[in-house]
């Protein structure tokens, strides 16, 4: 209780210990005597709370301290009002029902009765400081330490400076967001309290250096404005802080790069650029994807006799790998790091990046050599490196048996597989056609709510790679390893597909009996994804795997249905031309036409009965008329379509795809490709078209495709072997000879491989 006391006509706030004891009229109990408090011991232990000082009216007060007290109270009240005003500006009144800012009033009718005498003792013990902690009681945690803010800035901020805590807080779930809001609030209050005027440059620089770079990125305009108001010049360390904050993240926009160049110009006016400045500058150009400007920076460093550091080499290597996609130049820079000096030796991070680049470009043997070189140097191996090598080995026929060995090394190191490792497990099992294992791994991801679009794509890929047991000639890769056998057996027994997770339509069986099972389940999963995650279905790679399931396991009707329902022709950029085709039937054809119509109707009824499709897809397609659940067709989808036309020998569908592929070449999506990529896609489609006509025994049409593009495409025996074998089988020796001549001419022209006898003949004709 606080009592107001007057001494010499001066008001003062003095704490008095008073206790309210209820009377008998309230308690209906006998009054009990309050034992007098024990005198305080002068030998107070460390950590005890010092009780409030007792004051007697007869005591002579310290008039000097009492006279200064009202001024301190006024200052505290002024700071408190300013603090309240700033807080009120940042509150959002619309969040009235927020569970974090509002609380329900407790129901007092459900509270137990209170023993007033016992409560009185507790209150007395609390205010007198004599209550002891129980044996099991846990003392409250100490408040987090505040930031070391200069005193003159702390005085200007007042109570608001106590809001700031260090960025590394363990008890806060959202430390970054909380600190960012506090810094913005703090700078606003500092600006309103006079800004930087009257403060020393050293204190200002020390204060701004406390701001984390991630938060500083959004506060740069406010800080520059505060410097301008105070008519102070920004020192070069602050400019460098701005640059470091702007270089955070994976990419840097052109506008941010302009700011970085501006700040570096200001730094160069105040001091000479050091190695740290050049390292940050090169890193910024790498993230801005302007590697061509790095040569000029290196030339400046050479003029100033500044050696190229290891960090600069690392940034250049990462730029060639992840931004420029120039694998060869990345390898050249990596070799320079190894043989230049001892200071520039690459560490495990650089080795990991180069190994990832080798895996991306299908150079698995080089990746393995670098891996063993890394181990010989005694460097640490991380989990992402092992999982990347496992994924790369699964793509190679020579090293695919080592894929699961690298994954099991993750368990040998005692690591818990992260999301990337788990996704690579899915990929290896899917690429191997192990549908049972892929389904189980995906089921585990459903249970932990960690499903990604990449994992879903690998599940669909496993269906497209499925081979029935009676046709499979090789064991699954995981069964070639003893650990793999135990791993597969245990995880299959641990999953019960009869208990669906999140309604995902897995069929209630862990065993895959035949291809109809795969067709039915993939169709049901596609329908479920249309209803719940339609954004997944707009990727061409996913649609290609979904369509390939019908190509490998179904018939033409199944393929045509999936091709039309999951993809569409993007007409952006295609010129609109009206085509009118007039067909006049002959007078002697009515009987044949009627017969043909009856046959088509009968075949369509048979196809509809044999179609394995989810009933939900039929209902969805009746209500959906646009392409929001489809992916735009690309060159790979057209390659699959023309391949299906040849496999199922459907001439009409082949003509339809051939015409639509011509329209696709006029679209914006094809025009945006590089000329090299366009030529490569056209050559692949031409190769599949030759195979299509060959499967239909239209050998002359297939040879016409080759002959019309002999000067454009590097035809080889890989594309022409099917046509040559078909010509030999049908006894068309002239056509086979013509195909062999085309292969010889194109191989010599495009510096390809030729046979030894053909090379001898070529050298004899050349004469040298």
From Swiss-Prot:
<feature type="region of interest" description="Disordered">
    <location>
        <begin position="28"/>
        <end position="65"/>
    </location>
</feature>
<keyword id="KW-0507">mRNA processing</keyword>
<comment type="similarity">
    <text>Belongs to the CCM1 family.</text>
</comment>
<feature type="repeat" description="PPR 2">
    <location>
        <begin position="309"/>
        <end position="344"/>
    </location>
</feature>
<feature type="repeat" description="PPR 5">
    <location>
        <begin position="418"/>
        <end position="452"/>
    </location>
</feature>
<dbReference type="InterPro" id="IPR011990">
    <property type="entry name" value="TPR-like_helical_dom_sf"/>
</dbReference>
<dbReference type="GO" id="GO:0006397">
    <property type="term" value="P:mRNA processing"/>
</dbReference>
<dbReference type="GO" id="GO:0005739">
    <property type="term" value="C:mitochondrion"/>
</dbReference>
<feature type="compositionally biased region" description="Basic and acidic residues">
    <location>
        <begin position="43"/>
        <end position="53"/>
    </location>
</feature>
<dbReference type="InterPro" id="IPR002885">
    <property type="entry name" value="Pentatricopeptide_rpt"/>
</dbReference>
<feature type="repeat" description="PPR 3">
    <location>
        <begin position="347"/>
        <end position="381"/>
    </location>
</feature>
<feature type="compositionally biased region" description="Polar residues">
    <location>
        <begin position="55"/>
        <end position="65"/>
    </location>
</feature>
<feature type="compositionally biased region" description="Basic and acidic residues">
    <location>
        <begin position="583"/>
        <end position="596"/>
    </location>
</feature>
<keyword id="KW-0677">Repeat</keyword>
<dbReference type="GO" id="GO:0008380">
    <property type="term" value="P:RNA splicing"/>
</dbReference>
<feature type="region of interest" description="Disordered">
    <location>
        <begin position="90"/>
        <end position="114"/>
    </location>
</feature>
<keyword id="KW-0809">Transit peptide</keyword>
<feature type="transit peptide" description="Mitochondrion">
    <location>
        <begin position="1"/>
        <end position="90"/>
    </location>
</feature>
<feature type="repeat" description="PPR 4">
    <location>
        <begin position="382"/>
        <end position="417"/>
    </location>
</feature>
<comment type="function">
    <text>Regulates mitochondrial small subunit maturation by controlling 15S rRNA 5'-end processing. Localizes to the 5' precursor of the 15S rRNA in a position that is subsequently occupied by mS47 in the mature yeast mtSSU. Uses structure and sequence-specific RNA recognition, binding to a single-stranded region of the precursor and specifically recognizing bases -6 to -1. The exchange of Ccm1 for mS47 is coupled to the irreversible removal of precursor rRNA that is accompanied by conformational changes of the mitoribosomal proteins uS5m and mS26.</text>
</comment>
<feature type="compositionally biased region" description="Polar residues">
    <location>
        <begin position="597"/>
        <end position="609"/>
    </location>
</feature>
<feature type="repeat" description="PPR 6">
    <location>
        <begin position="634"/>
        <end position="664"/>
    </location>
</feature>
<keyword id="KW-0508">mRNA splicing</keyword>
<dbReference type="Pfam" id="PF01535">
    <property type="entry name" value="PPR"/>
</dbReference>
<feature type="repeat" description="PPR 1">
    <location>
        <begin position="274"/>
        <end position="308"/>
    </location>
</feature>
<comment type="subunit">
    <text>Binds to mitochondrial small subunit 15S rRNA.</text>
</comment>
<keyword id="KW-0496">Mitochondrion</keyword>
<feature type="region of interest" description="Disordered">
    <location>
        <begin position="583"/>
        <end position="609"/>
    </location>
</feature>
<protein>
    <recommendedName>
        <fullName>Mitochondrial 15S rRNA processing factor CCM1</fullName>
    </recommendedName>
</protein>
């Amino acid at each position: 209780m606080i009592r107001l006391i007057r001494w010499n006509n001066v008001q003062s706030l003095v704490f008095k210990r008073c206790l309210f004891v209820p009377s008998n009229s309230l308690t209906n109990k006998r009054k009990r005597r309050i034992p007098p408090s024990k005198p305080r011991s002068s030998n107070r232990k460390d950590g005890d709370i010092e009780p409030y000082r007792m004051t007697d009216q007869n005591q002579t007060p310290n008039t000097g301290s009492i006279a200064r007290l009202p001024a301190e109270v006024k200052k505290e009240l002024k700071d408190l009002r300013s603090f309240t005003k700033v807080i009120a500006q940042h509150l959002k009144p619309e969040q009235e029902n927020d569970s974090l800012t509002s609380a329900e009033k407790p129901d007092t009718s459900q509270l137990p009765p209170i023993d007033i005498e016992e409560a009185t003792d507790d209150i007395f013990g609390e205010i007198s400081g004599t209550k002891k902690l129980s044996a099991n009681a846990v003392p409250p945690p100490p408040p987090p330490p505040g930031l070391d803010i200069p005193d003159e800035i702390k005085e200007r901020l007042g109570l608001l400076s106590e809001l700031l805590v260090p960025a590394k807080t363990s008890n806060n779930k959202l430390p970054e967001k909380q600190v960012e809001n506090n810094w913005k609030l703090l700078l606003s209050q500092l600006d309103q309290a006079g800004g930087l005027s009257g403060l020393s440059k050293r204190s200002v620089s020390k204060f701004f250096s406390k701001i984390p770079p991630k938060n500083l990125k959004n506060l740069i305009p406010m800080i520059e404005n505060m410097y301008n108001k105070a008519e102070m010049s920004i020192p070069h360390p602050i400019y460098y802080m701005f640059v470091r904050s702007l270089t955070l993240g994976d990419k840097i926009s052109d506008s941010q790069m302009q700011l970085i160049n501006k700040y570096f110009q200001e730094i160069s006016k105040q001091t000479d650029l050091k190695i740290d400045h050049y390292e940050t500058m090169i890193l910024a150009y790498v993230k801005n994807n302007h590697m061509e400007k790095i040569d000029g920076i290196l030339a400046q460093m050479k003029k100033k006799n500044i050696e190229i550091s290891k960090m600069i080499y690392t940034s250049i290597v990462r730029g060639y790998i992840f931004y420029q996609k120039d694998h060869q130049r990345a390898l050249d820079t990596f070799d320079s790091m190894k043989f230049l000096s001892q200071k520039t030796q690459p560490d495990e991070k650089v080795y990991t990046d180069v190994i990832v680049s080798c895996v991306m470009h299908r150079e698995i043997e080089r990746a393995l050599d670098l891996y063993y070189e890394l181990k010989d140097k005694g460097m640490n191996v991380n989990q992402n490196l092992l999982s990347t090598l496992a994924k790369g080995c699964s793509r190679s026929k020579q090293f695919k048996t080592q894929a699961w060995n690298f994954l099991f090394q993750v368990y040998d190191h005692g690591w818990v597989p992260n999301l990337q490792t788990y996704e690579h497990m899915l990929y290896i099992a899917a690429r191997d056609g192990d549908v049972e294992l892929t389904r189980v791994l995906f089921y585990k991801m459903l249970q932990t709510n960690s499903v990604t679009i990449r994992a879903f794509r690998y599940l669909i890929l496993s269906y497209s790679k499925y081979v029935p047991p009676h046709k499979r000639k090789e064991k699954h890769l995981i069964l070639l390893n003893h650990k793999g056998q135990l791993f597969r057996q245990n995880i299959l027994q641990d999953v019960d597909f009869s208990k669906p997770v999140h309604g995902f339509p897995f069929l209630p069986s862990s065993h895959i009996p035949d291809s109809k099972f795969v067709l039915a389940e993939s169709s049901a999963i596609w329908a479920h994804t249309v209803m719940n995650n339609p954004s997944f279905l707009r990727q061409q790679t996913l649609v290609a795997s979904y369509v390939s399931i019908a190509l490998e396991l179904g018939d033409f009707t199944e393929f045509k249905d999936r091709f039309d329902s999951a993809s569409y022709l993007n007409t952006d950029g295609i010129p609109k031309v009206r085509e009118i085709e007039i067909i006049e039937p002959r007078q002697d054809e009515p009987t044949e036409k009627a017969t043909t119509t009856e046959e088509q109707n009968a075949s369509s009824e048979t196809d509809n009965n044999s179609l394995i499709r989810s009933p939900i897809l039929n209902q969805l397609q009746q209500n959906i008329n646009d392409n929001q659940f489809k992916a735009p067709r690309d060159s790979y989808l057209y390659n699959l379509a023309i391949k299906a036309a040849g496999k199922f020998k459907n001439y009409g569908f082949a003509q339809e795809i051939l015409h639509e592929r011509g329209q696709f070449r006029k679209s914006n999506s094809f025009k945006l490709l590089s000329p090299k990529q366009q030529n490569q896609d056209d050559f692949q489609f031409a190769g599949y078209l030759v195979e299509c006509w060959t499967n239909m025994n239209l050998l002359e049409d297939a040879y016409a495709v080759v002959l019309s593009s002999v000067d454009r495409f590097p035809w080889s025996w890989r594309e022409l072997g099917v046509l040559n074998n078909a010509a030999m089988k049908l006894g068309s020796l002239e056509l086979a000879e013509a195909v062999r001549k085309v292969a010889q001419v194109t191989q010599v022209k495009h510096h390809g491989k030729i046979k030894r006898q053909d090379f001898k003949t070529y050298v004899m004709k050349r004469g040298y």
